Amino acid sequence: MGMNTGLVIAGVAGATALAISAAAIPFVAPALRRVCIPYVPATTEQLANVSRALSLATSSNSNKKGTLIDLGSGDGRVVLQCAREGFNSTGVELNSILVAYSKYRSIREGLGKETRFMRKNIFKTDLNPYQTAVIFGAESLMGDLVPKLSEMRSNTNLLACRFPLPENDAWKLEHQIGEGIDAVWVYKRN
């Protein structure tokens, strides 16, 4: 093996390591934030519970096909499912790779007009235009989220998945669907 072959192998190995590191950064970076919210895809049971929760939350509305935002939308599966159920759905996610993947899936599944995905911090997102919000949060995040969620208008809905909101005056618990990690709490804004 000549000197040039060794340099080529070393260059390829270095470029591969750099590419893997660059691809991993959006998935590792959440661990470095004040509140760690790792990407964990929603399970089939969680998606079914979200669907049941949406039915309960919107059953009193004459127009079930309102606007919905998923705060921390990950790979977009909740946004896509909600769009299939007739909601004009938006996903907000910090991980640029997951945002790109969500946009790709949306187009591939023919839901590009019913969905929108943004790379944005949930705490810097205007929630006022939305009738329903979905959050798969971490327990440590839920208390910090209550003041942000107060931007939503009265009589709007919140689906908190995996962890409930702490007791507060702004949101009234209406239903709990499922148990444990698959649980969904349905709240109505006072």
From Swiss-Prot:
**Biological role stated in the UniProt entry:** Mitochondrial protein-lysine N-methyltransferase that trimethylates ATP synthase subunit C. Trimethylation is required for proper incorporation of the C subunit into the ATP synthase complex and mitochondrial respiration.
* Gene3D superfamilies found in the cross-reference section: Vaccinia Virus protein VP39
Which reaction is the catalytic activity of this chain? L-lysyl-[protein] + 3 S-adenosyl-L-methionine = N(6),N(6),N(6)-trimethyl-L-lysyl-[protein] + 3 S-adenosyl-L-homocysteine + 3 H(+)
What terms describe the molecular function in GO for this protein? protein-lysine N-methyltransferase activity
Question: What is the native source organism of this protein?
Answer: Caenorhabditis elegans
Classification via PANTHER family: FI06469P, METHYLTRANSFERASE DOMAIN-CONTAINING PROTEIN
Gene Ontology terms, cellular component aspect? Answer: mitochondrion
Q: Name one GO biological process term.
A: peptidyl-lysine trimethylation
Source species, domain of life: Eukaryota
Keywords in alphabetical order, please. Answer: Methyltransferase, Mitochondrion, S-adenosyl-L-methionine, Transferase
Q: Where is it mostly found?
A: mitochondrion
Which of the seven top EC classes does this enzyme belong to?
A: transferase
Family membership noted in the UniProt record? Belongs to the ANT/ATPSC lysine N-methyltransferase family.
E.C. code: 2.1.1.-
SUPFAM superfamilies, alphabetically?
S-adenosyl-L-methionine-dependent methyltransferases
Keyword Lipoprotein carried by entry = no
**Protein name per Swiss-Prot or TrEMBL:** ATP synthase subunit C lysine N-methyltransferase
Q: Where, per UniProt, does this protein localize?
A: Mitochondrion
